[in-house]
Amino acid sequence: MTIIRTAAAGLALLLAAACTAPAPPRSQASQAAGTACAQPQGPPGAETAATIDVIEQAYFCILGNYYSGATLDARSLLMAGFVALTQELNRDGRDIPEAAMPALTGDRKADWTAFENAYRKITDQVPDLRDKLAVVTLEAIVAGLGDNHARWTHDVKRPPDYYDGYGYGLGFQANVNGPQVNGNPGTALPPLFVTAVQGGAAQAAGLRPGDIIESINGSVPFIDGKATPAIAALYPQYPQARPVRLRLLRQSTGRRWSVTLKPGVYQRDLAALQVVRSKLLEDSIAYVRLTGFAPDSANRVFKAISRLRTGRTLSGVVLDLRGNGGGSPVEATRLVSAFGHGKVTAYQCTVDGTCATSRTDDTVELLGLPLVVLTDRGCASACEHFSSAVKDLRLGRLVGTRTAGVISGPAQPYLLKNNTTLGFPARHHLGPNREVIDRIGVPPDHHVPLTPQDAATGRDPPWPRP
């Protein structure tokens, strides 16, 4: 499980899929929904342009395989797609009389045929916009699911002079990021401030952790305590290259100033790229920071603790999951299993309430140490699987802030006929107590938010020790 366009691209590559469908007669809708797509068969070929046939395949793939595909009102997806199509026509100044939504009856196949006929009449009149209209239409259909683990991944390109480990963007991270920007923006809280400077334009401009961002391109990041869309401009994705103007405040000096940052490729600190980092606190506490549930990450955490345990008696473990965007639920389960056996860590449920049970891997050796887990709104997906299990099963204490609430369910991938990837969950996630975590998050046992002053000094706020 993962969230954001970059994360989506990583998920698509990790979970390569294959999906095929025969070309149906134009007078009929697609074959039965269940035959629209299939599970992975191999890596994708070269991507080609999206077409109405690709949109059709995705539509029936969703109806046949998505969590609520069998019960949802498919008209809502077609409506979302048509809204996006007409808005794009307006943006290009090319609106046409025929761009009216056809009548829909609730018959999924008949409705698709009506939609397709209207779509073709429109796009035949603006052939130079055909590719763009297909993209916005399919993006809107997928977004119409309202599911933070449903996405269509396409047009993923590396910028020139980009190498593994490099970054692209403005070169800094703020306290509102990742899942809060893309998956659950209602969770963001003011003030907006820099938490890490990674390189690039931000480093060249002299930004520092703790600097408060008062405006972005002239727009405030919060209105009446609610996040505004302006925050998304802090995280451009290639090929987005428009400069971003920030108004900043450094509280330690009272200085206010403005900078303009241009997105670009930058080298990142190699240490910051490590998935697992560890150190000893107070001569007896193992501190381990885990940035994502990558393959083999649980074993790497165990090895880090074992190294710190050599030659001394540990009194506890602090596992820092702040900013952990998720990854493999298998790794999350293995990590939980080092703190408890014979437990249910989660349920994965279909729309009719039939649930599969996720249990601890009792082949994992118990650490036998008290546990404190540091969480924040950047802890998403598999990170929330782990955190909810720790809290519900009383395996340790959560300290920090509530998690992201971006954990609808583990996504399954499908490769569409133009070699782009469609991903969404077939089941939705519930915590060990059968509670919904998605859009809500996991509350901490001790609420200890990070402040601009904490970020500026590089010190964590006081939190309970194991």
PLM feature spans:
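Bacterial N-terminal signal peptides that target proteins for export
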Residues: M1-A8
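C-terminal motif of bacterial Sec signal peptides marking the signal peptidase cleavage site
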Residues: L15-A18
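Bacterial signal peptide processing site
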Residues: T20-P22
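N-terminal low-complexity, Pro/Thr/Ser-rich intrinsically disordered segments
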Residues: R26-D53
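Extended, small/polar residue-biased N-terminal targeting/export presequences
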Residues: I52, Y67-G186, P243-R245, Q251-V275
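Sec-exported extracytoplasmic/periplasmic mature domains
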Residues: Y59-S68, F82-R94, E116-P127, T137-A150, ...
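PDZ/PDZ-like domain segments forming the peptide/carboxylate-binding groove
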Residues: G106-R108, G165-S215, S219-I223, P295, ...
